[in-house]
């Protein structure tokens, strides 16, 4: 078992590199432990198509490694939820296009007393992706063949902010509450353009077209949860109330511009121009009350009531 005084200190890692064609990569993590307190920084940036952090980086940042060093008997459960914390995780896999991404955040955990525990975190991530595709294809039909060529370009970027807070407070030996709150803001922009031609083997154009679509969206989310707990004098008899509240706002707008020229019918051109926009606002309220009564011989009776709007 590690003694508490041996868990005081700091450690971290740093990595930096540069290459041809303005390629770069950087990563840093700093973790500091004190009595009943942990603070962490995690950051990265690169344009070599590497997204997210490793599992060990995430555990050090969130405090999982400190829990593992705590020693003692019993069992321990570690939940990996990068989406909930806002930390992007890297589980491998191939990424298409040229991507530039930055991510970084702060985490602070502190036990103010045996009755008061606080966990907070903030994380930001940015991703920029450029994707170019070209297709050259010959199609063979019973009536003959034709050549199809297409070039496409996709540009997209996304910003994400997320903050989390958890306060666990024991009021006395029988009563406690746990407050959990999270807020996030995200914004994304996309532009996609394709140009294509269809021609006979001798180069005679049959049709050609160009299509451009754009989409811009943003969203704000806020969720809070208050868990109230009471333990009666009789062992195993408890009552709890869980109150939830959430706000969600999302909006998006997009455009479509398309022009297609058909040469098999001289002078026939098809033009399309469209715009669309959406706004969604939601509020949610919820409450759950649960009562547990011991029946003896490790058996319990639980009654609960739940409401959600």
Where are the regions that the model predicts?
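Solvent-exposed loop segments that connect transmembrane elements
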Residues: 143-145, 195-208, 259-271
């Amino acid at each position: 078992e590690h003694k508490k005084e041996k868990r005081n200190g700091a450690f971290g890692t740093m990595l930096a590199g540069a290459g041809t064609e303005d390629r770069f990569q950087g990563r840093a993590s700093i973790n500091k432990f004190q009595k009943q307190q942990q603070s962490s920084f995690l950051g990265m940036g690169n344009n070599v198509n590497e997204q997210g952090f490793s599992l060990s980086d995430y555990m050090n940042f969130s405090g999982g490694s400190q829990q593992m060093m705590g020693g003692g008997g019993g069992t321990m459960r570690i939940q990996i939820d990068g989406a909930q914390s806002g930390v992007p995780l890297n589980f491998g896999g191939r990424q298409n296009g040229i991507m530039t991404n930055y991510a970084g955040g702060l985490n602070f955990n502190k036990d103010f007393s045996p009755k008061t525990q606080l966990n907070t975190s903030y994380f930001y991530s940015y991703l920029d992706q450029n994707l170019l595709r070209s297709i050259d294809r010959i199609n063979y039909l019973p009536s003959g063949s034709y050549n199809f060529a297409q070039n496409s370009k996709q540009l997209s970027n996304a910003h994400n902010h997320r903050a989390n807070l958890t306060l666990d407070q024991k009021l006395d030996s029988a009563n406690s509450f746990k407050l959990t709150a999270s807020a996030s803001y995200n914004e994304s922009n996309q532009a996609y353009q394709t140009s294509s031609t269809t021609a006979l083997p001798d180069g005679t154009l049959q049709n050609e077209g160009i299509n451009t679509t754009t989409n811009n969206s943003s969203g704000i989310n806020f969720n809070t949860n208050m868990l109230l707990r009471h333990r009666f004098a009789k062992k195993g008899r408890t009552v709890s109330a869980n109150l939830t509240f959430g706000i969600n706002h999302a909006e998006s707008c997009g455009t479509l511009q398309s022009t297609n020229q058909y040469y098999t019918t001289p002078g026939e051109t098809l033009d399309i121009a469209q715009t669309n926009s959406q706004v969604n606002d939601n509020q949610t309220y919820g409450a759950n009350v649960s009562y547990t009564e011991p029946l003896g011989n490790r058996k319990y009776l639980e009654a609960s009531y739940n409401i959600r709007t």
